[in-house]
């Protein structure tokens, strides 16, 4: 049985004070919902602080991105080696904001995916369609292509030690949430697509749903057969709200 995972992506938010308050406010939720893994992905500058604050807790953490290179003249980047040294378990790769704002292709995402397990991190592969692609009925083709880039680069079994985050781009931070039935349809398709290549991988890999996940809808979303938790944005910045989302995964 796949363990539930609820991961907060703080994006470009937080201060030293808010990080301390937020982590301290999540300690009980992580302890009380023992069947759920609770993780946070802070901005890189706050990772050392999160490392210290989570030392004696059940909270895990990761980065929002990592570079394809492990060292060198790459100003502004953070390598998987560096992130691992500061205790990160995870790193997001291919978040839609990286794909759209920074122009990261599926091939670049596949390169980032490949370098993370080589250096001890678990990649959280983010995939999903835009509103235009959704309305054109292209969702399944889009997520298949995004997955195929990784499979071509690293092989299907690389997903044994990875997490998939499905985020319909049109639902991220917009307040527009897919119904539980629609939210379940694409993770189910992802698992079916994987099963055609390796049934064991398909059964093992955790698939998270992201896109305006909040306390009011978390239990119903996480209750779907092929959704193993959530990749949570805005609600993860409030300890009370995020704790309720976490509880939804253990309901």
Curated annotation (Swiss-Prot):
It holds the Pfam family TIM. It catalyses: D-glyceraldehyde 3-phosphate = dihydroxyacetone phosphate. The active site is at residues 95, 167. Keywords: Cytoplasm, Gluconeogenesis, Glycolysis, Isomerase. GO terms for biological process: gluconeogenesis; glyceraldehyde-3-phosphate biosynthetic process; glycerol catabolic process; glycolytic process. It comes from the Bacteria. GO terms for molecular function: triose-phosphate isomerase activity. It is found in: Cytoplasm. Involved in the gluconeogenesis. Catalyzes stereospecifically the conversion of dihydroxyacetone phosphate (DHAP) to D-glyceraldehyde-3-phosphate (G3P). This is Triosephosphate isomerase. The gene is tpiA.
